[in-house]
Amino acid sequence: MTAILDIIRDFRTAQGEVFRIEGTQDGPYAAVDPRHMRIEAAAGASGRIVVVHTAPDMSSLEIVAAEDARLEITEVFLAEAFAEIAVKQSARSLCRLTAVQLTSANASYTIDLDGRDAENMLGGVFLAGGEEHCVVKLRTNHNVPDCRSNSYIKGVAGGSARGEFCGLVYVAPDAQHT
């Protein structure tokens, strides 16, 4: 676990309750144990952020991608955290989410595709052993036509460990070709 923290030590720090991304970022940012954080990507901006949970706390992460924004968010759970992640995407935005649970954790994702040609990709893995319990919940809302989403969750649980996945893709009545 310390190897992961050593790797991100050289990343720039994403601090504060609101982290704004303007333009194109050269390298990744890291946020360690955010209690509440809002990530805002301006129109046409792009960036990469690694969020690491090292303490058994509640966490709330809100991600807002404006038109043509590109975001890559990696979330790593090293402690029994409870995280709620809300993503709101505008037209032609792309958000790639990667979730890695290496211990008991509970992550709940709500993704709103609110603009045409918005695209969301979520990939996740959990590894649970002993008495650990990993939970991943996902709700993807296709609120407008011509959106795309792709979700892929895999898990391994050994011993008495348990893993849960609950997912729903909602397509609004007028959201055709999505």
What are these regions (language model features)?
Residues 1-5:
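Terminal domain-initiation and capping elements
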